[in-house]
UniProtKB/Swiss-Prot annotation:
Record note on disruption phenotype: RNAi-mediated knockdown in cells of the pi uterine cell lineage results in impaired basement membrane mobility. RNAi-mediated knockdown, on a lin-15 mutant background, causes adjacent vulval precursor cells (VPCs) to adopt altered cell fate. RNAi-mediated knockdown, when combined with knockdown of apx-1, on a dsl-1 mutant background, causes adjacent vulval precursor cells (VPCs) to adopt altered cell fate; phenotype exacerbated on double mutant lin-15;dsl-1 background.
Extracellular membrane side: 16-279
Subcellular location: Cell membrane
Gene Ontology annotations for the cellular component aspect, listed alphabetically: cell projection membrane; neuronal cell body membrane; plasma membrane
Job of this protein: Probable ligand for lin-12/Notch and glp-1/Notch receptors and involved in the mediation of Notch signaling. Involved in the lin-12/Notch pathway signaling of cell fate in vulval precursor cells (VPCs) and in the postembryonic mesodermal lineage (M lineage), acting redundantly with dsl-1 and apx-1. Functions in uterine cells to promote basement membrane mobility during tissue remodeling. Required for oocyte growth control, acting redundantly with apx-1, perhaps signaling via the glp-1/Notch pathway.
Tissue expression as described in the entry: Expressed in the gonad distal tip cell (DTC) of hermaphrodites.
Glycosylation, residue list: N72, N105, N194
Listed name of the protein: Protein lag-2
Topology, Cytoplasmic side: 307-402
Length: 402
């Protein structure tokens, strides 16, 4: 069911809603509805328009500040897109005897052939109780103090508790309720400072129309029928430490074994020194993120280190291959003919030796590397190479006559 909650304004300002009127609409065809509340003063109210689909129920909730036994409203059916009226406006009236009244069904057919069903119910708003919603009780504050507001708006202990401060558990065996009856405290707690509490006793609250001191008398009422309640003691570990469980409506009563107390017998009165210590380590989302970040950083560092270790020797070898070898330091020797026109007997040749080495580009590229120094293939070929001098050559070149 798709529920639409619409607040309809009445002639009186709703300062604090006490009453809720629920209406459920079902149409045989798709149609739009213009809904309007009709008051006794016939003052104008703002209409509300909503769409209905075939066999699709839709719900309205009207909030009122007071309970009125007569509720009047009007309905105008129109086309969904054009807004053209479908027949005349329909006026309906619903009468209430109290908030405990069941749904009131009203089914009719309009002049346009559309069948419309309207079901209406009146209930009290939140924190209002009674047959006409005349009593106020703050259920939220009562729940915080283990109390509840009963059907008449009276402040009583919550189900399963009793005592002046609702701190004592109720033993359902003292009531012996039948037919899903609930054993509760009858004490009415004061809702005002000047009120006094009533006497307390355990009684049975009956359901599904049963009556009697123990809900043993069958008085079936279809409007008060509720679904069978599951056994509250069927829940796993409803009572702890070997306690006996007794259901009491939606609550349980635990009869604790010797040495245990508490609502569920979870508190031990005997203190013993444990022989073992159990340590539970739980990692939060933040700690897991830190560990993952550190692990990724370590893995990334290892990968970078492997690349450096692998490529550093290769780089050194490449640099070694690219180095230019130094040439041999050989003494420079030159021969010079003084008189080329002289006879063979008269020719004079001077040999000049210097200690200054001259390395030109041709010698640089024709010299052999050091590791091939002993190979004659790379030696410089000269006609007559004098042996190197045993002594250091003089600083001034010397001339020898041949």
């Amino acid at each position: 069911m798709i529920a639409y909650f619409l607040l309809l304004l009445t002639c009186l300002p709703v300062l604090q809603a006490r009453v809720e009127v629920h209406q459920e609409f079902i149409s045989s065809k798709r149609v739009s509805v213009r809904f309007e509340i009709v008051t006794e003063s016939h003052s104008p109210n703002r209409p509300v328009t909503f769409d209905l689909f075939p066999r699709g129920p839709k719900t309205n909730i009207i909030l009122l500040d007071t309970f009125n036994p007569v509720f009047n409203f009007s309905i105008q059916l129109v086309q969904p897109f054009t807004g053209q009226p479908l027949g005349d406006r329909i006026y309906r009236k619903v009468q209430f005897s109290g908030t405990n009244q069941p749904w009131i069904n009203d089914t009719f057919t309009t002049t346009s052939g559309i069948s419309l069903s309207v079901a209406t119910e009146v209930t009290c708003a939140r924190n209002y109780f009674g047959n006409r919603c005349e009593n106020f009780c703050d259920a939220h504050l009562a729940k915080a103090a283990r109390k509840r507001c009963d059907a008449m708006g009276r402040l009583r202990c919550d189900i399963g508790w009793m005592g002046p401060h609702c701190g004592q558990a109720v033993d359902p065996r003292k009531c012996s309720c039948e037919n899903d009856g609930i054993c509760v405290s009858s004490m009415i707690h004061p809702s005002q400072p000047n009120q006094t509490s009533s006497n307390e006793q355990l009684i049975c609250e009956c359901t599904n129309g049963f009556t009697g001191t123990r809900c043993e008398i069958f008085g079936f009422n279809q409007f008060q029928l509720t679904a069978p309640r599951p056994d509250a003691c069927s829940v796993k570990d409803a009572c702890l430490n070997g306690a006996k469980c007794f259901p009491n409506g939606p609550k349980v009563f635990c009869s604790c074994a010797v040495g245990f107390i508490g609502e569920f017998c979870e508190i031990s009165l005997t203190t013993t020194t444990p022989t073992t210590v159990e340590i539970t380590v739980s990692t939060s989302g933040y700690s897991s993120a830190v560990y993952i970040t550190v692990a990724l950083f370590v893995i990334f560092s290892i990968i970078i280190g492997c690349f450096k270790y692998k490529f550093k020797p290769m780089r050194q070898q490449a640099l070694a291959r690219g180095q230019v070898p130094e040439p041999y330091k050989m003494p420079e020797t030159k021969s010079m003919l003084i008189d080329p026109e002289a006879s063979e007997a008269q020719k004079k040749v001077f040999t000049i030796e210097g200690s200054v080495q001259k390395i030109d580009e041709e010698v640089r590229y024709t010299s052999a590397p050091r590791k091939y120094e002993s190979n004659n293939e790379y030696a410089v070929i000269q006609k007559s190479t004098p042996p190197p001098p045993s002594l250091s050559p003089p600083s001034i070149p010397a001339c020898h006559y041949v």
